Each structure stands twice: as C-alpha cells, then as structure tokens.
Amino acid sequence: MFAADRSARRTFRMNSLFQKLEASPLLARGGPFAVFVLLTFCQGKFGEASRYWFYFAKTIVGAWLIWQVRPLIAELKWKWSWEAAVVGVAVVAMWVGIDGFYPRLDRLLSQVGLAKAKSETELASELWNPHTRFGQGSALAWMFIVTRVLGSSIVAPPLEEVFYRSLVYRYVVRPDFQSVPLGEFRWTPFLITAVVFGSAHQEWLAGILCAFAYQALVCRHKRLGEAITAHAITNLLLGLWVVWRGAWKFW
C-alpha cells in the first residue's frame, strides 16, 4: 500500500513537471540548461571528489532532461551532414591551435581587476584530471573520463544548442522568441549569443569563434541538427585529444 502511494506521488510529480514544461516553451528550453549549470557550479564545492561525482550526476540528469523535453522541442533533432562534420573538426583544430595566443578567461579577468590572480599551483590544482584524485590508471578514474567524453559529446551539445541557438539567440530578437524563425540572421543576436557562449569557457576566444561557426550552420539550414552534430564532433575530438595528450586544461 505504502509503495503504491509513493509510486502514485512520483507519477503525480512527474506529470506536474511535464505539464509545466509543456506550458512554457521558455522553461522547456532554458530549464534543463539551468539545472545542468547548477550541477556544474556544485563541482568541487563539496570536497575534491565532488568535482567528478557531480559531473557524473549532471551527465545522468542532463540525459534524463533531454529525454523529457524531447517531445516538446521540435527543433531538438540531430542531423548528420559532411558540412557539420567539417565544421566540428575545424572548430576543434582552431580550439587547440590558438591556445596560448590569448589569455584564458580567469587570467583575463585578473588582469582587468575583476578576479584574484591565481598562482600556477592553484591553477594546476583546479585541473579536471581524475588520475590525480583516484590514482593513475584506476578503474574509477577511467569511469569518470569515459563519462566526461560521453557527456560532453552526447548530452551537452543538445542542451547547449537548444539554449543558446534556439532560445537565447531568438529571445534577443524579441521576448516572443517562438515568433522568430529558427536561423533568421541578425547581427545583434549573432554577436551577443557568441559572447555569452564564449564567456562560459576558459578558452573564451575559441568559444566565441566556435559559436559563430555553430550559429552559421543554424542560419544556413534553418534548423539545429547540423549545429548539434558539429558540437558533438568537436567535443568528442577535444575529449580524445585531452586523454591522448594529457591536455587536462581543456577540461
């Protein structure tokens, strides 16, 4: 009896959540991303190990949220094309290639007095490297590495593309964002969305250029599919580069 009651309450809460998402196109596109960002913020806030466990949690939660909102967001569809593949490869080559030619975001903010400068030791301690926390080559370290590669290439792209390219870009045009055709080109949202996207990454300049490329795909094809695919390819290749070269600073 009690088990049935608990099951009924869970079903009621799930139905209530789905109804709220269905009633608000903005919440359906922005809510999952907000949860994803909140869990990202929690990484490292509850001890060193939480940096990795919260990434694991946000990957699972993010995948579940995508599944929940998928029926509500018509543009949330992957689309393969060679053009998307080329853009994805070009972006990761650019991301790695220009590294070192401009200051990372934390250093830039410290240079303009908006953040405290960090020593090399502090920066090294903040690297997302499971081998240093759980032991070189340990099963737990590799579990988190695989989780990050999969999470960044399968979960993050649809969440971020729906938020930035579908919601933010069109909302900048006008709050009634659904009245703005997906992929309509305008300079103001094109630039603002790219800067917002770039500022969410330590490699801010690469992030801005990356956003230009993904948004160009959306504007060209009038859909998100190619941008999601390009984003996934970029993150997958960058993840493999990080693991192969030990370039943990990109994570």
Predicted region positions:
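Short, Lys/Arg-rich, polar N-terminal cytosolic tail immediately upstream
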Residues: F2-E22
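Helical anchoring/docking segments at protein termini
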Residues: N15-F18, F41, V96-G97
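Juxtamembrane loop-transmembrane helix junctions in multi-pass integral membrane proteins
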Residues: S16, K20, L38, F46-A49, ...
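Alpha-helical transmembrane segments in multi-pass membrane proteins
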Residues: S24-A93, Q111-K118
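Transmembrane helix-loop junctions in multipass membrane proteins, especially transporters and channels
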Residues: K45-E48, R70-A74, R104-L108, H201-Q202, ...
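Juxtamembrane helix-loop-helix connectors linking adjacent transmembrane helices
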Residues: A74-A156, R170-E184
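Transmembrane helix-loop-helix hairpins at the membrane interface
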Residues: M94, G135-W251
